[in-house]
Structure formats: C-alpha cells, structure tokens
Amino acid sequence: MALLQIAEPGQSAAPHQHRLAVGIDLGTTNSLVAAVRSAQALTLPDEQGRHSLPSVVHYGETNVLVGYEAQDKSALDPQNTIVSVKRFMGRSLTDIQSGVHRLPYELHASENGLPVFTTPMGQVNPIQVSAEILKPLIARAETTLGGELAGVVITVPAYFDDAQRQGTKDAAELLGVKVLRLLNEPTAAAIAYGLDSKQEGVIAIYDLGGGTFDISVLRLNRGVFEVLATGGDSALGGDDFDHLLVSHLQQAWQITEPGSQLARQLLIEARRVKEALTDNDSVEASVVMADKTLTCTVDKSLFNELIGALVKKTIGCCRRTLRDAGVSVDDVIETVMVGGSTRVPLVREQVETFFKKTPLTSIDPDRVVAIGAAIQADILVGNKPESDLLLLDVIPLSLGVETMGGLVEKVVTRNTTIPVARAQEFTTFKDGQTAMAFHVVQGERELVEDCRSLARFTLHGIPPLAAGAAHIRVTFQVDADGLLSVTAMEKSTGVNTSIQVKPSFGLSDTEIATMLKDSMKYAKDDITRRMLAEQKVEAARVIESLNAALAKDAALLDEQEREELVVAIAQLDAVAQQDNIDAIEKAIANLDDKTQDFASRRMDNSIRAALKGQSVDNI
C-alpha cells in the first residue's frame, strides 16, 4: 500500500481518490470511532445519537449482545457478560490468576496458555471478544461514511507489550479490517491537539477514566513522539468517585444494606450529582425508597473533600512518573486531559497547580483519543493535503551518511518500501583512530552540501588500530511510522551508539519533487564533483599513509631517496588543492611508482622481524 502517489518529476500521478478510514479508541470501559469529515475529525454517533459504546459483550444461548444491550445483562447474567476484556488482552491465564477468584466468568487456559471464556455459545478468547466490540463500531462507520473502510487506526495504552498489541491487531483482522497502525493512546491525544507540529518539548498526558488512571510523559522532537515513562493506578478512576458519593448518601439517608435495585439507583444518582457539580456549586440528590423520596444537598466543597485523597493520589503518580522520565515539572510544555473524569473541577485545579500551567481541555476528554486516531488514519490513507504532515510507506528520498571529502554514501535508496533495515560497513581513515563522527543525510545528490542534514552522532571506543583495520557496521532501520534509527557498532568490541530521527518531518511533496528534479538536472555535474572529491580523498589517504611510513621506517632509505619521496609528496599535495581530476590521478600514480621499492623494503623488514628467533620447524 502506497500512502503517497509518487511520480517522477514532470510526470503526473494518478488522480487523487478520497479513501475512507477511521480511528478507534478501543477502551477498557467504553469505545468510540471517529473519522475526518469535511477536514474536521469527529466521533461518529449511533442511530440513537450516542457516541460511546460500552466495551461489554454478552453471550446468550443463540446471540451475542454488545454495548448498551449487553450492559443491561450484567446484573442478570454476570457469568456470560464480559466487561473490561482489554485487561485480558495478550495475557496468559497465569498472568491474571491472582484476580480470577474475583471474576464471575468461567475461565480456562487454552493450549497456548491464553485465557478462554466458557459461554453458552462455546469458548471464546479475548481477541474474539474484542472483535465483537469492534464489529458495531466498524458497521457504524461504514454506514455513516457510506462505503467500505480502507483501514483503521486503533489506539492502545503506551505500556502495552508486543503480545497485547498483536492481540488488538488480530481482533480487527478477524473482521477482515486492515489495521493501518496501532497508535499509543497518549500520542493520539497529543495529535488531536496538533502538538505533533511543535518543534520539541515534554508533554504530559493525564488520563483519568472510569476505572483506571494513566499518566504518560512524552518527548516531542521534530515530529517524533518518544514515550519517556508511564505510570498510574489500574484500580483508580471516576467509578471510585461515584462509590464514595454513594457511601456518603447511604450514610446521610441511613441506608445500611440496600437491595440490588436501590444500589443501582444510588449509583445512577451519584453519577448524576457528580456530573452536575461540574457546572453547579451545589446539587440536590434524591432517590425513591419504599414510596418515600429521600433528598440531600451535596455541595462542591463536600464532594471535593470526599474525593480529595484520590485526586492527590493521581498527583503522586504524576510526580513519580516525571522522576522516572528524568524530567522536571518545569520541562513540561503542555498537559493534555483525557478521560471523562478529568471534567471534575478539583481534578483540573490540582493538575494545573502541579504542572504550573492550564491543561488542554478544549476537546471532549472522552473523545480526544479517538479524534487523534482519526487524524492519523486520514493521513495514512493519503487524504491529507500535501502541505500537512507527511507519512509514507516508501522512502521518498535516499538516506545515507557523509564520508571523507563531503561525499554521500547512500544506505537506503529512495522508493524502498518500509519497514526496512539496511547495513553497511565503514572503516577508519587514520592510524589509532578511536572515534568516528557520523552525519546522517537525506537526498539524491552526490555531495553532502547539496543534501538535507538529518542528524549527527559520534561513536567512541573504537580500538586504536591501523587505518582501515577497524570495522564499523552502520545499520539504518525505518519502521512503519517512518521513524529512522541509525546504529553504529564496532564489530570486534561490540561498542555501539544510535540516534532516532523522522526524515519526513517538515518535508512537503513540493520539496521532495524539487530535490528529485535537482538530482537529475545536476546529475552529470554531480558525478564529476564526486570523482574529484574521491581523488582528493585518495590523495590525502596516500599522503597520510606515506608520512606515517616515513616516520617509522625512514632508515630504510638513503638521503636522496628520502628527498625524492618528500618532493613527490609535496607535488601531490599541491595538485590535490586544484580541481583537476587527471592531474591528481597522475600525481598519485607517480608517487605510487616512486614508493614501490620502499614498500618492498618495508615488507622484507617486517618479515625478518617476524621470523627472528624462529626455527625452521616452528615455521
């Protein structure tokens, strides 16, 4: 799948077709689907106008219910109503064994150790359950958008490992849906606010949902999001606020043991009061019990007192996660609020106080992750205008490193499909060289000065060997997101260093086309300049090598011979300063001819030294 219609300069690409793609927030409690429509990313509602879908699946004797219908079955048939299946994704039964006794499901281990739920419709695994949640979201999207989807971007927690990510991808592929990308939830939130277009800085994503709290610290550098650290509490969320309020109401109304119906009524009323306190200083709570209406006024200060310890606990998680990330509060340039529970005024106040800046809240915190995923999906199917962020499934311009003389050695050539890995070996230029500087460049020209600089780094710890003896393996890896990792490793010691960069950052289609046209326009001139630079590098290498040899073995020559070599070296050095390829080549050949006898004597001398004290038998 090519994400950008690429044509050679002067040729037109195929007419652009709008492709349908969506972003899906596959949540623990609720899930959403979003799409870019008329250049605006929006979540898509169902026929009843509801945007979120409860992540709940009920297996009956003959049918499967998903969402609100399944949620209604949770009290009546908890054993066959699966909630929070995301917690089981990619985990073995052993991983979750400690919590099994508290779960109403009948769980068994499959042949590969993964958990399976026993239901009236047979055994199902977490991947199949997740696919049931995705199914109505996909159907909603195709109905709303009026066509088949070209692909989806699904969000996952930043801390998900490979098994959990693969399980999420498999759930979509069970439905025959192409997964364009799995996107970290905090990264999706940052994209929704357009933070990916900023140059650099640290971003905190504060995610307080119904059942969990997550804090993620990201570093943004030239369009690349790096997750520095994640933290949180998997058993702390807005539901805990509700339960504290329920306990208060029970105490106020002297209700000791409510039945299931009253307990549900209390919980619904607690949620209503919590939400109403977002915009009101006080709210009257009421429930009907035994034909009697109980009322109680709850003000904001009382509610804050009830939940204060829990909010403080989330701030403690933030403090620890910043410490794990190795950054301070002052390093954080933006704070993004995710999750419906971040609407609570006390939460926003505490977050603002801790991070010393007003958090970003203009996008609905329940929908922000899905919206970010939709923006990414729109880019990945090629619907983004060329002036916007560029994401490709091919390398648009060659990637390489600078070599001696300002030359470019291409490691990954343009139009190579990604993901890709390429490696090449380089060596040292001077005797005793213990470090090597690398300059990563992008472009089609032969000289570094005509290419785009991407990054620089240095490999230290190279063994001090003769020039050309050390072997440094340089590996270029470009992942599916277009992120380039360059690693340099000295083969004998294993010492290595690496750097990451996004080659597409700040690069438009127009700039790519211009660079390609220039490479063709100046091709002949570039080859000539490259040949000249190569001859100059070779001249410098020969001079360097011969000077080292004279310093070590000058005694092997008489005075006249030494003088002739010194003159020849000076002549080559002078010619190398000029821009005459043939003259430099002749001067190198002349010096090579004059050093033949010297080289033979050095070889004989080395052999004698090696054989000294050795018997014929040993040899």
UniProtKB/Swiss-Prot annotation:
Gene3D superfamilies recorded: 1.20.1270.10, 3.30.420.40, Actin, Chain A, domain 4, Substrate Binding Domain Of DNAk, Chain A, domain 1
Claim: Transport is one of the keywords in the record: no
Transmembrane annotation, as ranges: none
Keyword vocabulary terms for this entry: ATP-binding, Chaperone, Nucleotide-binding
A Pfam family matched in the record: HSP70
CDD domains linked: ASKHA_NBD_HSP70_HscA (cd10236)
Highest taxon above the source species: Bacteria
InterPro entries: ATPase_NBD (IPR043129), Heat_shock_70_CS (IPR018181), HscA_NBD (IPR042039), HSP70_C_sf (IPR029048), HSP70_peptide-bd_sf (IPR029047), Hsp_70_fam (IPR013126), ISC_FeS_clus_asmbl_HscA (IPR010236)
The keyword Manganese appears for this protein: no
UniProt-listed GO biological process terms: iron-sulfur cluster assembly
GO function terms (MF aspect): ATP binding; ATP hydrolysis activity; ATP-dependent protein folding chaperone; unfolded protein binding
Function: Chaperone involved in the maturation of iron-sulfur cluster-containing proteins. Has a low intrinsic ATPase activity which is markedly stimulated by HscB.
Family of the protein in this entry: Belongs to the heat shock protein 70 family.
Family annotation (PANTHER family): HEAT SHOCK PROTEIN 70KDA
Stated name of the protein: Chaperone protein HscA homolog
Lineage: Bacteria, Pseudomonadati, Pseudomonadota, Gammaproteobacteria, Alteromonadales
Gene name, Swiss-Prot/TrEMBL: hscA
